[in-house]
Amino acid sequence: MKMAKNDDKKQLKCSFCGKTQDQVRRLIAGPGVYICDECIELCSEIISDEFEEDIQIDMTSIPKPVEIKNYLDQYVIGQEDSKKSLSVAVYNHYKRINSNNNSNDDVELQKSNILLLGPTGSGKTLLAQTLARFLNVPFAIADATTLTEAGYVGEDVENILLKLIQNADYDIERAEHGIVYIDEIDKIARKSENPSITRDVSGEGVQQALLKILEGTVASVPPQGGRKHPHQEFIQINTTNILFICGGAFDGIDSIIERRTRVSTLGFGAEIQSKKDKDIGKLLKQIMPGDLLKFGLIPEFVGRIPIIVTLEALDRAALISILKEPKNALVKQYKKLFELDDVELEFKDEALEAIADEALKRNTGARGLRAIIEETMKDVMFDIPSKEEIAKVIINKDAVSTKMPELIEAENGKRTPIKLKKSRTRKGPETA
């Protein structure tokens, strides 16, 4: 009888399926619980299927190019051709991911990263941010000027990917379908067209370091950022399906394009262009990969950003539209800020024109609009919270130059509360 009891005690079972240890290959013990190899395999399949299903849902509901452009139109004024080109490029990128995941075809679609080329304040960063928000994918912005070749003072290129992983809440699968915008990419051009004998750690060296992650590789990313060292653990991330958008002003490239195009228009019967015809925006539309090589990008780098989207400098009309038309227009933002203090804010059309003119004078594009408004209203925004008698502020043309907006007092000496409109919940993703 004692022998039988001992045998019963030794007969261990899986706590999930009930199979005994001699019915399975392996039985793993935990604190008061057992699990067999078959149950482990089943759990692994269920979890991996759920992950694949989640990613597939995100990737199969790709908006059409028209839908992408319509969304961009709500936030980005002008740049019609650029928005079309960008919408098509982004649609094809995520379509390629689905094709390579699902198709048994031998044809594998190759990755196409994007180069946004245009003057400061033309909307390059805004386009990339708006795209990521609409597609509901993780998004990261990196500054190319802070990057250096591995082993030198500065940031390694892998730190770009760390920002993306952090913005995806360390969900690697989600980060692998995100968008990375690398700004100031023109600042890492090598100093001359010919390869340098001396080491260019912040120019050509960075371009070389970026090649692998742009093309698609499994990168090792330090989880805390900083430099790599052999005794730390790394986060592994596959960059094959990450869309890289590089942006830069490329000051001076118009001269390179002009020299190239001028050669083809020499001789008898050639059309003589006036200075007015030599518009920088029109010149940029004629850009060729060879022009980027002459500017200082290496051939391998140019080959990994095959889609070139050019943006034009914003004119006076576009800047005025930017001030008042987009969903998050600056005029709407400042009106909302003043409403929170129960003060009405009014911008006269002449004031918007003066603000646009000042931005053109400073050559800062749309980026300088907020700074000009802040300068105009700095003193008013300082005083308003303390002055209960002020009910309305009017910004006219003179206020832009004198920094003294017109103030209107309340009839009874004290302003009445303004009922704020409840913001409607917008369909679609708000954050990336």
Swiss-Prot record:
Domain ClpX-type ZB, chain residue ranges per copy: 2-55
Annotated positions binding Zn(2+): C14, C17, C36, C39
GO cellular component, one term: HslUV protease complex
GO BP terms: cell division; proteolysis involved in protein catabolic process
Listed transmembrane segments: none
UniProt keyword annotations, A-Z: ATP-binding, Chaperone, Metal-binding, Nucleotide-binding, Zinc
InterPro entries: AAA+_ATPase, ATP-dep_Clp_protease_ClpX, ATPase_AAA_core, Clp_ATPase_C, Clp_protease_ATP-bd_su_ClpX, ClpX_bact, P-loop_NTPase, Znf_CppX_C4
Pfam families xref list: AAA_2 (PF07724), ClpB_D2-small (PF10431), zf-C4_ClpX (PF06689)
Disulfide feature: none
SMART domains linked: AAA, ClpB_D2-small, zf-C4_ClpX
Residue sites binding ATP per the record: P119, T120, G121, S122, G123, K124, T125, L126
Biased amino acid composition, Basic residues: 416-426
Region feature Disordered, mapped onto this chain: 411-432
Organism domain of life: Bacteria
GO terms assigned for molecular function: ATP binding; ATP hydrolysis activity; ATP-dependent protein folding chaperone; protein dimerization activity; unfolded protein binding; zinc ion binding
Family to which this protein belongs: Belongs to the ClpX chaperone family.
Family matches, as HAMAP family: ClpX
PANTHER family: ATP-DEPENDENT CLP PROTEASE ATP-BINDING SUBUNIT CLPX-LIKE, MITOCHONDRIAL, ATP-DEPENDENT CLP PROTEASE ATP-BINDING SUBUNIT CLPX-LIKE, MITOCHONDRIAL-RELATED
Functional summary from the UniProt entry: ATP-dependent specificity component of the Clp protease. It directs the protease to specific substrates. Can perform chaperone functions in the absence of ClpP.
Subunit comment: Component of the ClpX-ClpP complex. Forms a hexameric ring that, in the presence of ATP, binds to fourteen ClpP subunits assembled into a disk-like structure with a central cavity, resembling the structure of eukaryotic proteasomes.
Protein name, UniProt field: ATP-dependent Clp protease ATP-binding subunit ClpX
Organism of origin: Clostridium kluyveri (strain NBRC 12016)
